[in-house]
Amino acid sequence: MTELTALNIPHMLVSAFEGIGTVGPLVHPSQSACLHCLDLTRRDRDPAWPMVTAHLGGYPAGEIACDTTLAALVAAEATRHALAYLDGHPSIVTNGTIDILPDWQRKRRTWAIHPQCRCIRNNPDSLRMVRAATRD
């Protein structure tokens, strides 16, 4: 994902495993919350998050089981948001995610650009001019 951000290419995370699917965020580089923003926010809320994410990232592709129906539902939800974006319509997964829970209910979460994330530093509009200290 770092390469997509560096190339200023919008992208969206889609995942489904162990009964829960997630669509989003739809990342507009330097304009919306990125995946690293989400990790930093989760770390702020839960100091154990880095250990959790290290465990989740240790599975080879295809190793974690996913229900076929859940996978289809997540794919349909992701397609809906991707097509809306391509048609020029705003998407609720920009600065947000939708979790599809085991009971098929949807849970929407909003995310903000994290102040410690490097993603916003790539946006020249976010740079602030700092006046040099002067001696009086």
What are the functions of these language-model segments?
Residues 1-136:
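Glycine-rich phosphate/adenylate-binding loop
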